[in-house]
């Protein structure tokens, strides 16, 4: 990305388009990831991604899989735009006379991009997680209440697909957080978000750049779109799995509502210790498969849009009405 100059408006538009397309395609998988990661202490309301999605559809309807999507669709445009534009900016600043960046400089550029994006990512994730996990908590509480009644009366086990109670909206959550905690309420889990997104960008951007370079024909200035897509998918999934333990910690810290008998956490280290003690090392890989399936197409689509230069074409048409 450092080998060509792209205007800032084009970078922002490309990032926004990529984010909107990507989120629309993979959001249900992201919802399953959040619910799987928030299952504590061996509780198995959902056994897998497919089990989670099936039960969500049965209890909350088809659009239940898109709870929290409005938050992502609203904020993913600035988030992706900042991430891609920042990485491109840092790569350009670190390059000398168009020479290929060293691995260290590529990692530094990725680090800068990951740091910049958390300005938007943290509040977006904070709101999204509350909305995504509300269905799991409501279903769990309903089941436990029904089990309490049945233990005295006898009868069959209640189903996890039982109807859920009304849940808050993103606007209500934002108002409540601002009223009770101020702006800091929206940035709860900022440290954990940095701990996830900075390493992810450090892994992703250099890996993508090198994979994309490998697939570029010597006679062409840039890689074909399918090479950029595959490179984005491979690099994205690898980076996502690598930082999944940090994502589990972040998700737990940002969840304001807890199910029955679920742990509360005072910080990153406390969260990591309790997860390790109560659930074992494998708990840090909860949702890793889902996260890889989310990040792979998300970044693949982003790189295709970015490298095809869709925004440049749109801006060109606006600047030249006769084109």
UniProtKB/Swiss-Prot annotation:
The keyword Acetylation does not apply. InterPro entries: Mit_carrier (IPR002067), Mito_Solute_Carrier (IPR051028), Mitochondrial_sb/sol_carrier (IPR018108), Mt_carrier_dom_sf (IPR023395). GO terms for biological process: malate-aspartate shuttle; regulation of insulin secretion. One of its GO terms (cellular component) is mitochondrial inner membrane. It is a multi-pass membrane protein. Solcar repeats lie at residues 6-93, 101-214, 223-312. This is Mitochondrial glutamate carrier 1. It comes from Pongo abelii (Sumatran orangutan). The gene is SLC25A22.
């Amino acid at each position: 990305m450092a080998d060509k100059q792209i205007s800032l408006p084009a970078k922002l538009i490309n990032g926004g388009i990529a984010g909107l397309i990507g989120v629309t395609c993979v959001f249900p998988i992201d919802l399953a990831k959040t619910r799987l990661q928030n299952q504590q202490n061996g509780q198995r309301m959902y056994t897998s991604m497919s089990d989670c999605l099936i039960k969500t559809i049965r209890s909350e309807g088809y659009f239940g899989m898109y709870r929290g999507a409005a938050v992502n669709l609203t904020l993913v445009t600035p988030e992706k735009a900042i991430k891609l534009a920042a990485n491109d900016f840092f790569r350009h600043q670190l390059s000398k006379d168009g020479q290929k960046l060293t691995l260290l400089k590529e990692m530094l550029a990725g680090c800068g991009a990951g740091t910049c994006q958390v300005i938007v990512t943290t509040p977006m994730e904070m709101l999204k997680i509350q909305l995504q996990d509300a269905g799991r908590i409501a279903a769990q509480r309903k089941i436990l209440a029904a089990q309490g009644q049945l233990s005295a009366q006898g009868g069959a086990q209640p189903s996890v697909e039982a109807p859920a109670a009304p849940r808050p909206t993103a606007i209500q959550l934002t108002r409540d957080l601002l009223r009770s905690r101020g702006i800091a309420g929206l940035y709860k889990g900022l440290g954990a978000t940095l701990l996830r997104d900075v390493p992810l960008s450090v892994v992703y951007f250099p890996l993508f750049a090198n994979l994309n370079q490998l697939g570029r024909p010597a006679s062409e200035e840039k890689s074909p779109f399918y090479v950029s897509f595959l490179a984005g998918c491979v690099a994205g999934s690898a980076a996502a799995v690598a930082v999944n333990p940090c994502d589990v910690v972040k998700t737990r810290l940002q969840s304001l509502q807890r199910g029955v008998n679920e742990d509360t956490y005072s910080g990153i280290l406390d969260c990591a210790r309790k997860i390790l003690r109560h659930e074992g090392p494998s708990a840090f890989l909860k949702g890793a498969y889902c996260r890889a399936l989310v990040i792979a197409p998300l970044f693949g689509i982003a790189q295709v849009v970015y490298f095809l230069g869709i925004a440049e074409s749109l801006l060109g048409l606006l600047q030249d009405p006769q084109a």
